[in-house]
């Protein structure tokens, strides 16, 4: 499988998806036709989200079609060489994808050679479940099971920092709560600016920041760019 799982879409001082464009270009391998799944968008319309994505990716020669715009979404997925899933609210993304019957077709198409690109919520959707999202559950997705394209759980936008005076839990504390009730999981704390690239059977960590791996009953392990999962 070919996957590009990004923690986030924007870095300080850079345009939207700017840091991801070289990564995407490097993994295209001649692919040009893409379907975009915009359902995580809540404060922007799906048309706006699709148009913005199409504009940014056009210089790479990628032709983007919004999955919500086509009469036959399953046929569009089958024809697509690239499946792109944008960030936003992971619960809405999963709900809409499940209700439209897209989960199994997307997973099958990616397993048969389509490139999967997802940032934030889109990275969460590639995991076995969405249980490591940071998002508010604004809708009920009727279960947390997701695409299961990547075998580990990703927590995007990972940071353990708290604002001064803040008395809430750290991100690690939230992850540790999950590992109490689901000790079989492995969670990747993927900070902003980092990504996981899967190609030719290898999953490789990229980005300038330390990534953390959390397992039940074990200390967190720090990983740097180049680590192979």
Swiss-Prot record:
Catalytic site positions: 120, 135, 157
InterPro entries, alphabetized: Class_I_gatase-like (IPR029062), Peptidase_S51 (IPR005320), Peptidase_S51_dipeptidase-E (IPR023172)
Gene3D superfamilies membership: 3.40.50.880
EC number: 3.4.13.21
Catalyzed reactions per annotation: Dipeptidase E catalyzes the hydrolysis of dipeptides Asp-|-Xaa. It does not act on peptides with N-terminal Glu, Asn or Gln, nor does it cleave isoaspartyl peptides
Biological process (GO), any one: proteolysis
SUPFAM superfamilies: Class I glutamine amidotransferase-like (SSF52317)
Main location class: cytoplasm
Alphabetic keyword roster: Cytoplasm, Dipeptidase, Hydrolase, Protease, Serine protease
Gene Ontology CC entries for this record: cytoplasm
Protein's UniProt keywords contain Membrane: no
Family matches, as PANTHER family: ALPHA-ASPARTYL DIPEPTIDASE (PTHR20842:SF0), PROTEASE S51 ALPHA-ASPARTYL DIPEPTIDASE (PTHR20842)
Function (record text): Hydrolyzes dipeptides containing N-terminal aspartate residues. May play a role in allowing the cell to use peptide aspartate to spare carbon otherwise required for the synthesis of the aspartate family of amino acids.
Protein name stated in the entry: Peptidase E
Organism, scientific name: Salmonella typhi
Encoding gene per record: pepE
């Amino acid at each position: 499988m070919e996957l590009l799982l990004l923690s986030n879409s924007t870095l300080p001082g850079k345009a939207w998806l700017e840091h991801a464009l070289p990564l995407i270009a490097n993994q295209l391998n001649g692919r040009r036709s893409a379907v975009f799944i915009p359902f995580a968008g809540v404060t922007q319309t799906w048309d706006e989200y699709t148009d913005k994505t199409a504009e940014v990716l056009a210089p790479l020669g990628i032709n983007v079609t919004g999955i919500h715009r086509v009469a036959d979404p399953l046929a569009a997925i089958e024809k697509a060489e690239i499946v792109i899933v944008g960030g936003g609210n992971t619960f809405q993304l999963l709900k809409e994808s499940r209700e439209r019957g897209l989960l199994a077709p997307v997973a099958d198409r990616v397993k048969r050679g389509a490139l999967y690109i997802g940032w934030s919520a889109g990275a969460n959707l590639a995991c076995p479940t969405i249980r490591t999202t940071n998002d508010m559950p604004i809708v009920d997705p009727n279960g947390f099971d997701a695409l299961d394209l990547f075998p580990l759980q990703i927590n995007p936008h990972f940071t353990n920092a708290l604002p001064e005076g803040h008395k809430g839990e750290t991100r690690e504390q939230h992850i540790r709560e999950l590992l109490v009730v689901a000790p079989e999981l492995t969670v990747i704390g993927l900070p902003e600016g980092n990504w996981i690239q899967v190609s030719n059977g290898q999953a490789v960590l990229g980005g300038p920041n330390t990534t953390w791996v959390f397992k039940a009953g074990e200390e967190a392990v720090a990983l740097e760019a180049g680590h192979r999962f």
